[in-house]
């Protein structure tokens, strides 16, 4: 993460979203990345920008997880409050955050059901907000962008209840994982295989 360039348009876009949200009374944001070291980088950059941020991944002890969650729920004017929580998939397990109404997916996992699990951290019974905002940060002209544009957007995964799409998403997820895990395929061949799964 220390070797990442300081000129980072992807992070700059996320920072703009975060700054806008911090103007709200409910300023809480959950941000996911598949990679722990990406979160270290984001945490450093956000702290440099003056935000109160913590990270939960598989290496964080349970007592610390519970403490971070309690501080994340505090109102924004509390000096002990956390504004932004950063998670890996493993880090988010077992704790729900219905009081938070914004999630940022800094990157997207290959398996679409993991996206549902991420969303499930905040979109649970007891969510007091009428609208939950989910931002998916996808760099254009990448295989990831093509996967999600073609496979997930077409079935409206972010337009309604994820549960209704579970069967379709599961099959697409299996197809994507098979292609993604086949190390013998070049990017061009992977792209061709992914296009073949369009309906």
Label the predicted regions.
Residues 127-195:
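C-terminal accessory region of SF2 helicases/translocases
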């Amino acid at each position: 993460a220390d070797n990442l360039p300081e000129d980072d348009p992807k992070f700059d876009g996320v920072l703009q979203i975060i700054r806008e949200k911090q103007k709200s009374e409910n300023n809480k944001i959950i941000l996911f990345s598949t990679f722990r070291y990406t979160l270290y980088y984001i945490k450093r950059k956000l702290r440099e920008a003056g935000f109160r941020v913590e990270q939960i991944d598989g290496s964080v002890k349970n007592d610390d997880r519970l403490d971070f969650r309690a501080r994340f729920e505090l109102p924004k004017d509390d000096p002990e409050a956390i504004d932004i929580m950063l998670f890996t998939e493993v880090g988010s397990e077992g704790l729900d955050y219905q009081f938070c109404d914004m999630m940022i997916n800094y990157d997207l996992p290959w398996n679409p059901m993991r996206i549902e699990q991420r969303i499930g951290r905040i979109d649970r019974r007891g969510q007091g907000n009428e609208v939950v905002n989910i931002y998916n940060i996808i760099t254009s002209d990448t295989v990831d962008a093509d996967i999600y544009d073609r496979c997930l957007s077409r079935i409206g995964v972010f337009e309604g209840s994820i549960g209704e799409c579970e069967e379709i998403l599961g099959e697409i997820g299996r197809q994507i994982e098979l292609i993604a895990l086949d190390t013998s395929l070049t990017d061009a061949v992977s792209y061709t295989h992914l296009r073949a799964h369009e309906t």
